Amino acid sequence: MAGASTSRKSYGRIFTLLRDHNKWFENSIPLIASENIPSPAVREALISDFGNRYAEGWPGERVYAGCTYIDMVETECMKLAKKLFKAEFADVRPVSGVVANLAIYSAFSDPGDVMIAPSIPAGGHISHGRKEHSGTAGLVHGLEVEFYPFDAKSMTIDVDATKAKIIDLEKAGRTPKIAMFGGSLFLFPHPVKELAEFMKGRGMHINYDGAHVAGLIAGGQFQDPIREGADTMTMSTHKTLFGPQGGLVLGRNEHAEGIKKAMFPGLTSSHHIHHMAAKAVAFTEALEFGKKYAKDVVRNAKALAESLSGLGFKVLGEDGGFTKSHQVAVNVLEYSDGGKIEARLEKANIIVNRQLIPGDIKAGRHYLHPGGIRLGVSEVTRLGMGTGEMAEIAELMKQAVTERGDPKRLASKVKSFRKPFQKVQYCFDKKLPAYEYVKLR
């Protein structure tokens, strides 16, 4: 009986914590660049019975029975993805952006091959990383990873230095098999067009990791990697592309079979069918509302960056206008380190993440206490905020970072600021409040 009592208490506590989390975000300013808020329709798809089913393989070629409606939804999902990104081929099965990248590694390289990618302090993602850093490319697939030369002033890849490095690698018999563009700190477009011909002339497969900027690409507000020369494009589906957590691979028909085999049976069994259905819903929303949303996101990011700079913050990328994406990067070393600033802001219910920035590793700073913070405006934009609100957010951040006033009082200000912004915009159905806890028991 004691065990039953304990389990019952845990049962109740879990749901209490879930409700508390929703209430917290209802009263916070969410600025995590890798997050967004799904529409009520996407949430509805996520709780469908699809989440209880298996559908191994490709539509029409399943290992299991009972997939009639799953196949129809997945076929529609692929059709929508291809339309959204103007792609010949789409595989909607990756359960994350990391799995999407693994599909590329598996399909187009072998362990021991070389890949060139952005380093983490230069904005690269851990899935692009070396084995010694526990990066997916090195640790899981056995790739030897070289890093692009990076221009810290312009916050993008140095084209001429990259060409020189690849020539040196070629002379050493280490021509990269894969060139990876994209990253997790991604302020400006990467030079795909400028490097594509040079890379393809050396037999390199070009992949563009659009995890962060997929929604901006779909909305015509960033760059167009496939038209610029990328062979394939990977992404997650829950950042600027406002769907459920998941991944997606795009490419040309000539790449389809390799990707399909990598995904199944290589990397997935069930591919979380309810998330696939929710992706399909999100793609319809992106096709209908994505252009305006992407434009508003970029406008808001620039407004937030300019407001922070005007308040004395050292915002990275000033020479290029601070940002052309949803992100803003700030060097906070004059106040403290990124970890401590993240904690100060969280006390005020302003949610950001610490960020390694160029120069950190050479200075001996690591991920727990880096020199910067990263901000993203995807979620606050979807809640209906505009450039005026970005100026208010900058002022609230200044108060929190400089510790002017009581954190509890500042959290109360944040709560008042958030009160008018409680519905998801850029979607077909706005009935359910964005963070309302839906009780099914």
Curated annotation (Swiss-Prot):
Pathway connected to this protein: Amino-acid biosynthesis; glycine biosynthesis; glycine from L-serine: step 1/1
N6-(pyridoxal phosphate)lysine PTM positions: K239
Q: Which domain of life is it from?
A: Archaea
Instruction: Indicate the quaternary assembly.
Output: Homodimer.
Q: What is the purpose of this protein?
A: Catalyzes the reversible interconversion of serine and glycine with a modified folate serving as the one-carbon carrier. Also exhibits a pteridine-independent aldolase activity toward beta-hydroxyamino acids, producing glycine and aldehydes, via a retro-aldol mechanism.
Q: Write the Enzyme Commission number(s) for this entry.
A: 2.1.2.-
Q: Which GO terms describe its molecular function?
A: glycine hydroxymethyltransferase activity; pyridoxal phosphate binding
Q: What is the name listed in the Swiss-Prot or TrEMBL entry for this protein?
A: Serine hydroxymethyltransferase
Q: List localization entries.
A: Cytoplasm
What is the enzyme's class at the highest EC level? transferase
